[in-house]
Design a protein with these regions (language model features):
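Nucleotide-activated sugar donor-binding and catalytic core shared by glycosyltransferases
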Residues: 1-11, 15-34, 38-49, 159-171, ...
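Short gly/pro/ser/thr-enriched loop/turn and capping motifs at secondary-structure boundaries
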Residues: 40-41, 57-61, 130, 134-141, ...
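Phosphate/nucleotide-donor binding subsite
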Residues: 49, 53-105
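Short glycine/proline- and acidic residue-enriched helix-loop micro-motifs
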Residues: 72-85, 156-168, 395
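Conserved nucleotide-sugar donor-interacting segment of glycosyltransferase catalytic cores
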Residues: 88-159, 207-209
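Donor-nucleotide binding loops and adjacent catalytic segments primarily
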Residues: 205-321
Length: 419
């Protein structure tokens, strides 16, 4: 079957769908992957048919407006800035998406592109598969992660947050989507869901991390999507970099610190704070600069190593703790490794994951805007305590016992498309 996968956003958005695309290709499907233009190297290494598209979230987040975007905790402000970013690119992506999906027999997407993908699937009358990194469909247990990060007192209240988000989000995106739907020859307003083919909505998170959710067959919990051992080997990512492996083996397990795509206004000052905090706690530090600390050059000393990126699943089992921004992928990898986590969250689903780890007893959560050297020291000190370490180890055992999410997701897609 000809499948187009729309993978836009940051690494945490694109790489899970890259893993799924590779697995679907191995199942015999003819897969085309549309990926953000700055994140096409990995899918190319996997031999996928990849088409770069113009959305470059890294560049956007390095602008003044992008930096403001990740600091907004108010839903309306966050949505307004999101749509401003989409407005410039949305029309161009619409052209790209129409061309890319022409002739497709199914479309796969994540939340970043779901509005476009749903309209395309409606226009072409083909199945739609959506991938949720975080619980984002109405349920009784957890509220919408952009509305509230803690469960509300009643099931009805939790469910109501999804309607609230949908109404607020539609207010900001409707003009853009009206234009796109008109270009597809569709009425401006989508028809009621009962008149459309029901999509498959893969729930891409661990039931260990979000317990208590039950869905029907159209919303299977598959776990987080990551590269399979076969694809890790194909991409040359199945073993640690030899120099990093030697550094890890030369001392005590370090703290991994990364802020991913979160902009750090003064990388040198942040690095100095990390160095002092780790020294006071007797820890070595492995710092992955990502986008947020990209101004820092790689360096190595016995107590501190700075690298651009690491493969979380390879590195974290060698670490004592992890401090990160709260993306779904690194949250899952840290818990799977059985180590405690400090989440310094900024936007989107990051606060949800930070609070979820606190509720599970395996982590500490602070807002990135509140992060100081004292806050970092306090949080990392808590990660050295017995209760958090024991709970993290327990959750790690549970997660490692779960099946690998990517083959499970591909099997669910096959079943859905064959129905």
């Amino acid at each position: 079957m000809r499948i187009t996968v729309l993978a836009l956003g940051s690494r945490g958005d694109v790489y899970p769908l890259t893993a799924l695309a590779a697995e679907l290709a191995r199942h015999g499907h003819e897969v085309r992957l549309a990926a953000s233009l700055n994140l096409v190297d990995l899918p190319r290494q996997l031999g996928l048919d990849v088409v770069p598209v113009g959305w470059n979230q890294q560049s956007m987040m390095q602008t003044e407006r992008g930096r403001e975007w990740v600091t907004k905790s108010n839903l309306d402000s966050f949505l307004q800035i999101t749509i401003e970013a989409y407005r410039d690119y949305g029309r161009r992506f619409g052209d790209e998406a129409i061309e890319l999906t022409a002739g497709s027999e199914a479309i796969v997407c994540a939340v970043v592109s779901e509005q476009w993908a749903a309209a395309l699937a409606e226009a072409y009358d083909v199945p739609l598969v959506a991938y949720d990194l975080t619980p984002s469909r109405p349920n009784d247990v957890v509220p919408h992660p952009l509305v509230a990060v803690d469960p509300l007192p009643t099931a009805a209240a939790n469910r109501a947050t999804y309607l609230h988000y949908t109404r607020r989000a539609w207010r900001y995106r409707r003009d853009l989507m009206f234009q796109f739907r008109r270009r597809l020859g569709l009425p401006e307003m989508p028809p009621p869901p009962k008149q459309l083919r029901r999509p498959l909505e893969l729930q891409g998170y661990s039931p260990t991390l979000v317990p208590g959710l039950t869905w029907d067959a159209y919303r299977p919990i598959v776990g987080d999507l990551r590269l399979t051992p076969v694809d890790l080997d194909r991409a040359g990512m199945s073993t640690l970099d030899p120099e990093l492996a030697r550094w890890l083996a030369a001392g005590e397990p370090p703290a991994l610190v990364t802020f991913g795509s979160t902009h750090v206004s003064d990388p040198a000052a942040m690095m100095a704070a990390i160095r002092r905090v780790c020294r006071s706690l007797g820890l070595r530090a492995l710092v992955a600069t990502g986008w947020g600390l990209s101004g820092l050059a790689p360096s190595t000393s016995p107590e501190l190593r700075v690298v651009p990126y690491v493969d979380y699943d390879l590195v974290l089992p060698h670490c004592a703790m992890v401090v990160h921004h709260g993306s779904a992928s690194i949250t899952a990898a840290g818990v799977r490794a059985g180590i405690p986590t400090m989440v310094c969250s900024s936007y989107a689903d990051q606060p949800f994951w930070g609070r979820q780890l606190e509720r599970l007893g395996a982590g500490v959560h602070v807002r990135f805007t509140d992060l100081s050297e004292d806050v970092l020291l306090s949080g990392m000190s808590r990660l050295t305590t017995g209760p958090l370490r024991r709970r993290a180890a327990q959750l790690g055992e549970l997660m490692r016992a779960e099946p690998h999410g990517t083959p499970v997701a591909a099997d669910e897609v096959d079943r859905y498309l064959a129905a």
